[in-house]
C-alpha cells in the first residue's frame, strides 16, 4: 500500500475513534430542573387606610388624600425572602383599587440598611419586556424573571435573614391604594411629586418611613424541584400583632428558622395573615365597602393561597375574630367555611397538606370585642373540631402552647406588648408567645405529601 493510502486509512481510523469517543463520552451536565417557589407575600386588603397597622407613623404628609392615593411618587418596599434563587419575579397588585395604576421605574436590589441599597445590586424589572405596566382595578401582574447577579450561591448561609429592596414609581395618581397594613417592617417612600427614584441606591432619596407594604404582594424565586413553600394562613395572630417591629419574630418566622436550620435553602414559610381577618365574614367586601380585617378567608383564598407557587403545606389558624362581637358567627358556620376552604385547596392543589391550628385563648382580653365567656366556649368547640373531625391532615396545637391552665387565658409571660411596650391586650401573644407557637409545630408535618413536577 502506498504512503498516501496508509495516511488515508489512518485518517479514517482517527475519525472513527473520535466518533466513538463522542458517542460514549458523558454529555455535558445539564442545569438542574427548577421551579418557581413563593418566597415572600404580603396579603393585601384595603384600600388604604382601612386596616390594622402597628407602629405606623402619621402618613398624611405622604398621602394627603386617601382618595387620590399616591401621586407621582416612589416606593421602596423592604421584604425578607424565605428562599433564595438566582432569578426572581414580583407581583404588583391593584386588587382593591378603583382606577388603573401605572408603575414604572421598577427595581430590585439588596438592602444595605435603612432605605439604602447595596451599591451595584439594583436590577431593572420589566413586565412583558416593558419598563412600565398598567394594572386594572381588581387585577395584579407578574413581572418577567429578573436575574439577581448578586446572588452567587443561593444556598449560602450568608443570605439568611438578608432583605431585598423593591422599588417602583407610581405615575400620576393611583387612586385608592391596595396595601398590607401590618407589615411590622419599616419600608420607605418619597413625598408626592418626587418622580421616579427607584434607580437611586442612596437612603436620602426616600425620606418617608412606613410600617406597611403598598401594591407589592408576592415575590417568587427560582429554586430546585426539591424546594417547597408553606403558607401560614390566618388573622392578626399570624400577622404578628404585638411582636417586635423589624424583629421577624412572628410564629411563621420562628417556624421558618427551625426548618432552615435543618433543610437549608429548600423551604419557604410565607405569611398570609391579615389583622382582624375572619373565616366567614364580612359578607360584602369591596373598595367601596372595606372592612379593616380584609375580605373573608374564603374570598381571599385564591389570591393568598391557590395562586402561589410551589406550595406543599397550608397551616390555617383562624376563627377567633368570627366569635368576637365584630363577627358573632356560629361555630357551625365557621366549621362549614373551613371544610369548604380545605376542599378548594385539595381540589386545586392535589397533594398539598392542610394543617389545622387550634385557636389561642382570648379569655379576659381587654379588647372590647373579645374576652367574654361565650367566645371562649365557641373557641373550645372549634378547637375540638380541628383536633378530631378528620378534616385536616394534622394539627398544630397552639392552644396548648399558649394557654394558662389556671386561668384559661394567655400565659402571663405571653401578655406584655413587645411592639410598643406596656400592657398587652390578652388577645395577642407577644414575641415570647409567638416563639412558643413556632416551636410547637411538629416539623414532620411540614414534609411535602407529594413531589412537584417542574413546570
Where are these predicted regions, by residue range?
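Catalytic His-Asp segment of secreted/periplasmic serine-dependent ester chemistry enzymes
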Residues: 278, 284-290, 294, 298, ...
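Bacterial N-terminal signal peptides
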Residues: 14-22
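Oxyanion-hole/transition-state-stabilizing segment in secreted/luminal serine hydrolases
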Residues: 239, 243, 281-333
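Structural recognition of the beta-strand scaffold that forms the well-ordered cores
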Residues: 229-234, 238, 267-273, 312-318, ...
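Alpha-helical scaffolding within the catalytic cores
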Residues: 74, 214, 252, 292-308, ...
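Positively charged n-region of N-terminal signal peptides that target proteins for export
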Residues: 2-12
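N-terminal secretory targeting modules
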Residues: 2-3, 29-233, 238-247, 263-264, ...
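Phosphate-binding active sites in nucleotide-utilizing proteins
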Residues: 239-240, 247-276, 280-282, 289, ...
